[in-house]
Amino acid sequence: MRQIFVLVLIVIGTYASTYAQELYVFTEPASNMPTKSIGVRITNEGMFNNPDFVSRTIPEVMLGFSKNLMMHAQAFLSDMDGKYRLEGGSIYAKYRFLSSDETHSHFRAAAFGRVSTSKRPTYTRDINLEGDNSGIQGGLIFTQLLHKLALSSTLGYAHAFDNSDRQIVGMPQPKNMLSYSLSSGYLVLPVVYKDYNQPNFNVYLELLGKTDPSSGQSYLDIAPAIQMILNSKTRIDLGYRFQATGNMDNRYTKNMYLLRAEFNFFNVLK
């Protein structure tokens, strides 16, 4: 029994070390979390555009139902409209439909969908379904692992629900949004993997863009980030996104830091 337990720990550690560079900070990879596992996240986002500083807190639960299907449930709380309050929530699901594995490399493709609700009025054409807008989104993710380097691209389309009862006169009423991203992650440490207790240190660089089809307005953000993974179960993310180019005004995510802690529990779902 003890030998089986040790083997399970080694497998978990190998999983975290091999795929750690795919755990992007601002986007999701096509790969899924381990089967029958639960993850708990707490994320804090701080924005410097208001002109005052505002922040959002996102508690999140993730469920790995199988190697191909996982789901996230999020709640959004912020002080963007005065006092700190609950803004809404979101359900996100991802289905991996393609896997191609080779030694030290693999390719994954997945489809995702999201439905969100938010109490907030809109101040911008940008559609952000993680706190700012009610709506739905769908898209595709493609991820390529090449030893210590992981590359991923995402293409999505979002539709915002009508919120005329909360709309402020003269402010934009966004309807649809095309989103796209290109993400890279590199495993810096450990240089040589020995056991699952070794910390993993990863660096990321992500390009995050959106286009409003109705107005033609768009933007492209650059988002560097660092990440530490401890004991294959605890993950700490720190990142910052800033605009490289664009003409979409009043965006909340234009200059934003992200700080996240994640805790994973393996083989707990029946």
Model feature map: region roles:
Residues Y15-S17:
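Intrinsic disorder/low-complexity segments
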Residues Y19-S153, Y157-N163, M171-K270:
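Transmembrane beta-barrel domains of Gram-negative outer membranes and organellar outer membranes
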Residues I4-G13:
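Sec-dependent N-terminal signal peptides
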